[in-house]
Amino acid sequence: MKSRQKGKKKGSAKERVFGCDLQEHLQHSGQEVPQVLKSCAEFVEEYGVVDGIYRLSGVSSNIQKLRQEFESERKPDLRRDVYLQDIHCVSSLCKAYFRELPDPLLTYRLYDKFAEAVGVQLEPERLVKILEVLRELPVPNYRTLEFLMRHLVHMASFSAQTNMHARNLAIVWAPNLLRSKDIEASGFNGTAAFMEVRVQSIVVEFILTHVDQLFGGAALSGGEVESGWRSLPGTRASGSPEDLMPRPLPYHLPSILQAGDGPPQMRPYHTIIEIAEHKRKGSLKVRKWRSIFNLGRSGHETKRKLPRGAEDREDKSNKGTLRPAKSMDSLSAAAGASDEPEGLVGPSSPRPSPLLPESLENDSIEAAEGEQEPEAEALGGTNSEPGTPRAGRSAIRAGGSSRAERCAGVHISDPYNVNLPLHITSILSVPPNIISNVSLARLTRGLECPALQHRPSPASGPGPGPGLGPGPPDEKLEASPASSPLADSGPDDLAPALEDSLSQEVQDSFSFLEDSSSSEPEWVGAEDGEVAQAEAAGAAFSPGEDDPGMGYLEELLGVGPQVEEFSVEPPLDDLSLDEAQFVLAPSCCSLDSAGPRPEVEEENGEEVFLSAYDDLSPLLGPKPPIWKGSGSLEGEAAGCGRQALGQGGEEQACWEVGEDKQAEPGGRLDIREEAEGSPETKVEAGKASEDRGEAGGSQETKVRLREGSREETEAKEEKSKGQKKADSMEAKGVEEPGGDEYTDEKEKEIEREEDEQREEAQVEAGRDLEQGAQEDQVAEEKWEVVQKQEAEGVREDEDKGQREKGYHEARKDQGDGEDSRSPEAATEGGAGEVSKERESGDGEAEGDQRAGGYYLEEDTLSEGSGVASLEVDCAKEGNPHSSEMEEVAPQPPQPEEMEPEGQPSPDGCLCPCSLGLGGVGMRLASTLVQVQQVRSVPVVPPKPQFAKMPSAMCSKIHVAPANPCPRPGRLDGTPGERAWGSRASRSSWRNGGSLSFDAAVALARDRQRTEAQGVRRTQTCTEGGDYCLIPRTSPCSMISAHSPRPLSCLELPSEGAEGSGSRSRLSLPPREPQVPDPLLSSQRRSYAFETQANPGKGEGL
């Protein structure tokens, strides 16, 4: 600037316009006011009613061009397109002219006097003081000041369009009009610079708001000014101020306002604050990782993202110009809410502008703004309040809050997708809960996520639900109807259970807010139908919190376990895969194994399965038989399923029909409905069409479950028998997916027929649970010995081989055999029911113990799922078809799903045992298989934050990997079956990051709702068997929804209670824990979040 001035000085005085002394320039030009001011003011008044006028900087090249024209032509044509397109270059040039004056318009010598004048607290006195100081101004300066002030007042009248109120204009103009030589010499450092800014802003704003009082009604000529000044000292100083006092403009400064007044917030330059804020916003918002490198940018994008309307307006105005400042933000808040942003923005924009004077002007404006704001605040004037600083502060706050929110809820997905491995990315993106901010966002925004809310009703969207958003849940829904009937056949149930668990995991990630533990009780007490669904979905599961009615959705999604999983499993994510494995198991076990946990801990992996099963049994309610059924389930399954009640033939028939039914998903749904309708009808429907046969058996089981909710023992007997057969079948199926599975299917069909007959007979006989339990126990004990030996022999062989091979292989074998049944499993809805029951823990315990408990041991032994949890067994064997269904539906994930079941056996067990991975800590003993699950699910150890996250978030995290990295563990396994579509959905939803959390949830909800119809019977399944809270008076209604698993739950409990031959290692005591079902429910309510979430993970992940 100095160099420019020097260069100009070299030329003739006539040629110099900028940087020339004002008085000298006016003398040479013969004008009362500088031509630059007059031309620019006229142009701005005509064309400059735009946002951010005088605050935004024009294009530097245009400013320089216009500057040269003024110096050469004296009066250039400002109406050329170049200037009309860049109006701000004209306003910037006008400010630059005053900024470059050797002596400021208000002169250096009067700076102290102005500062003293504004220091007066009372407005009348201040007005007098200011008038006295203005009288000391040279006449050219006074005329020019009056012309400029009237122009600015006129422009302030358009503040609605320009967002430039009197305060904003004062802030941007003050540094150009009033400066302190001493402060400039000091380099604008220290408190003196801030004081200068205050004085500048306060003085200029005061003059702007009192133009009429200070300059009279009309402009005064030079002589008039002189005479007027001399004549007015008394009148104006005394009378005029007092008279005009009532007339202060809206921006009148409070009488108390002083140079030092105002909050320190005003002190910093608005420009500085705003710029810093923009930069921080850019990086903090985490719009992109490179945002860190965008600090140099104007920050328009960042501000645009900010919720502030002013910033948005700034962006718009800024778009037209190159200046980074946003014209939309006014420099001052209050009357000039936009003014404050202007102060902030204006200075920042000038600085970026190439025009040095402009940037200086902005800086001084910034300083002035700072002063004005403190002064205004001190005065407390409504208009003069530091609206500008407030606006800036508010903008900063908004930016900070928005950044935090966006980082947590919006932008997390991008970073994860970019930097993290696929499995971690998917996990992170699904619940953006890995980040602490994300956890906050999910606690706030996450609650909004439909997935969290819908998760309670997995029936509607097992896969597409919150976590299983992908399409597979839909498939699972379809499979679920058939699977429910197939629940009797272990293999099919097993896959669906895994799918359910996965969906539950996903939902848990969403519903971590709604503690599964607490919501699970809600499910129980919500409604019979809803509760039944809730139980089926996850008695221990907590969909009830969100919406009892969502139980069906939760069931399909296997939400219950997922939610629990998340609360307890956050450590899972934090832990390494191995660590997470252990964490999952305890989580699954802790909730469900309130009573049986010790057992589970004592037991081996298989025993853990049984223990988990036992835990589920308590959840299931007074179904100790389930434990016994679990224990003696294998023998009973073989013996009882085949011989007990002499329904083995029927059971086989049911199995065959079930297989056929698997082949025909449509039939499954129909049969499912039939099963819901009545046991006989369901059985007949299932038998009538062998395609639906399996579904018929399951449906009969469902009916039995309904009845079993009343006659749980009877239903459990039948179911346990059916499950025993299913176990035998599943064990065979596991070892020999082809032939043995078929035999098992036949056996199970016969068993189902027997169960149906038994169920009918028992229902007719009075539905005596004890009688049924005794009968089942007797039959189961008999068959426990017979079939247990057979099944266990096979199972142990299978378990050994499969465990060695890995639960995945066992599940794969089952999946192969189950694949043939996959239609069955899909038809059963057993996947949804089983997994949901597992998730619910109680429902699963009943359903799985009946149908799956039997399989449980086989699966645990043969598949090594016993290590994971009983409920996994239940899910696998209790709902082998469901599991198979899950495995079959997404055959590729089948091994994974099998493995999750095997390891945490989340399918069979919602109970922590099944999850042995990283549950509350109960099932840690359950182990290797579970560990495999977790490993298979890279448990996203990425951030310890996960541990802090609610279980829902963890489960969410785990679910995500299912899509990107199908794993045998619960993360991937469960969704695999049921979430072929759901996985895609989930992965896109989580990993894509493109889908907002809410959008993903909404998608999951839609899918869940679509699938809800098919899944409801699964919901009822858990209801009937699992919860004492759920009215068992309506077992039929419950069974209809959860037919496959309810049978397993009911029959299995009977068997478990009566005969724990195989379950002996699980020990019948778990059956006793079943008796304190309400207690376990309470426990689960508290831990359900963790426990069920873990099983869901084990299965799904």
Curated annotation (Swiss-Prot):
* S-S bonds: none
Which CDD domains does the UniProt record give?
RhoGAP_CdGAP
The record's listing under Pfam families reads: RhoGAP (PF00620)
Compositionally biased tracts (Pro residues): 459-472
Alphabetical list of InterPro entries matching this protein? PX-Rho_GAP (IPR051576), Rho_GTPase_activation_prot (IPR008936), RhoGAP_dom (IPR000198)
Q: Where is this site: Arginine finger?
A: 55
Which of the residues bear the PTM Phosphoserine? Answer: 576, 996
Where does it live in the cell?
Cytoplasmic vesicle
Q: Where is composition skewed (Polar residues) in this entry?
A: 1080-1094
Looking at the keywords, is Phosphoprotein present? yes
GO CC annotations on file: cytoplasmic vesicle; cytosol; intracellular membrane-bounded organelle
- Bias kind Acidic residues: ranges: 360-376
Compositionally biased tracts (Low complexity): 508-520, 976-991, 1053-1069
Q: Name one GO biological process term.
A: regulation of small GTPase mediated signal transduction
Reported function: GTPase-activating protein (GAP) for RAC1 and RHOA, but not for CDC42.
This chain's protein is named: Rho GTPase-activating protein 30
Which species is this UniProt entry from?
A: Homo sapiens
